């Protein structure tokens, strides 16, 4: 048995955390969630687990007859894309700052501050490929905004194909044979945040009279068969599609930027399934497990069915992995979505300096300023320990190292 079993008053918690630290607060948050009567079988916990807002990052929450909106959270559909290109390390320019700048020009990124009218993280004039992706989203957007007009006043179309801030990134990586990979991390942007926030608040309002009976107000839920349950699932499915198409558009524009710098064809003539991957790690969907149809919420976890390919990034400056799922049913066929934090962003900014950041990322062309100190590699768990703890969940296909990293 490769997991630790945590017993509770209701469902147990199975934790793939051997050799990695787990905060006491995260354990308590997991115990609180496991107390809910509609948890199916058990909660599965990945080795990158840490305390989260609403629910525990790195948890897989199977439910029957209900969904907890705060467990999905506000970064709906957040996930990863990776593409193995036709390029090798020799094809990259000597001056990697030039490549980083080209990517930054190709993909809007960053947070708008003060009273600046221009949103740095949005398009002024979206390109043609964004228009094509939006066409796939338009019908769902019409339903969403007709039923909930509040979502008209959100960043949506102009956020498609853009990079959010925080731990989201675009990277150029090399594998063991020096083949160039593009890897990126983003989600459903402003519209996904608005959908998540609204339905979390709505669930709490609908359960106002029962909130005191819950272990936490964040565990307010919608019951299957109700109008809000159906609307939430439909809105979340749309946001998850937005997130997937957002990453596709970003990837297309990074490919174009890389092509302009190298003057070489970036995409391989034929790409294998393990060489082009788009996967969510913050989402909910209906799945079959243990012979029953249930809802699975992965909060910072990746689907890892037998033969299914996934992406597990390390911290900025650490290794990342392309993996193949082993279909471990006890984990609800899941694996970690990254390394997982060992300290809060606030603590990291107090503990480390710009000089620490420069030393830790000396081998990567990336930002090395005070605003990204919270992403310093030392703020995250050891990715090798994380991978060892889930050796029965996935097998490593490629190991990647970053050479360029773009942060919002």
Which functions belong to the PLM regions below?
Residues 34:
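Beta-strand elements of modular eukaryotic interaction domains
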């Amino acid at each position: 048995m490769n997991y630790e079993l945590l017993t509770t008053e209701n469902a147990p918690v199975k934790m793939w955390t051997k050799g990695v630290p787990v905060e006491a607060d995260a354990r308590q948050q997991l115990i609180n969630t496991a107390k809910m009567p509609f948890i199916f079988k058990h909660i599965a916990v990945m080795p990158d687990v840490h305390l989260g807002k609403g629910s525990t990052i790195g948890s897989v929450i199977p439910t029957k007859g209900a969904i907890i909106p705060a467990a999905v959270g506000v970064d709906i559909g957040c996930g990863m894309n990776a593409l193995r290109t036709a390029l090798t390390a020799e094809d990259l320019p000597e001056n990697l700052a030039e490549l980083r700048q080209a990517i930054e020009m190709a993909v809007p990124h960053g947070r708008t501050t003060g009273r600046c009218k221009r949103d740095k993280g949005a398009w002024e004039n979206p390109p043609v490929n964004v228009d094509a992706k939006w066409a796939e989203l338009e019908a769902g957007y019409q339903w969403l905004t007709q039923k909930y007009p509040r979502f008209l006043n959100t960043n949506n179309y102009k956020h498609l194909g853009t990079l959010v801030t925080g731990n989201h990134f675009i990277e150029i990586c090399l594998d063991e044979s020096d083949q160039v990979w593009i890897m990126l991390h983003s989600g459903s942007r402003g519209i996904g945040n608005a959908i998540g926030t609204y339905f979390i608040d709505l669930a709490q309002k609908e359960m106002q009279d029962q909130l005191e009976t819950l272990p936490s107000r964040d565990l307010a839920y919608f019951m299957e068969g109700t109008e809000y349950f159906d609307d939430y699932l439909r809105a979340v499915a749309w946001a998850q599609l937005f997130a997937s198409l957002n990453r596709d558009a970003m990837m297309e524009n990074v490919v174009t930027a890389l092509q302009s710098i190298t003057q070489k064809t970036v995409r391989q003539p034929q790409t294998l399934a393990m060489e082009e991957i788009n996967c969510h790690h913050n989402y909910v969907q209906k799945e079959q497990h243990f012979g029953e149809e249930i809802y699975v919420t992965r909060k910072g976890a990746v689907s890892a069915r037998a033969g299914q390919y996934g992406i597990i990034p390390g911290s900025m400056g650490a290794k990342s992995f392309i993996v193949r799922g082993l279909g471990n049913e006890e984990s609800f066929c899941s694996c970690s979505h990254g390394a997982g934090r060992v300290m809060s962003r606030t603590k990291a900014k107090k503990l480390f300096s710009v000089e620490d950041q420069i030393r830790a990322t000396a081998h990567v062309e990336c930002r090395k300023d005070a605003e990204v100190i919270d992403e310093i590699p030392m703020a995250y768990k050891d990715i090798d320990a994380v991978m060892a703890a889930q050796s029965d969940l996935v097998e490593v296909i490629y190991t990647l190292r970053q050479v360029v990293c773009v942060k919002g």
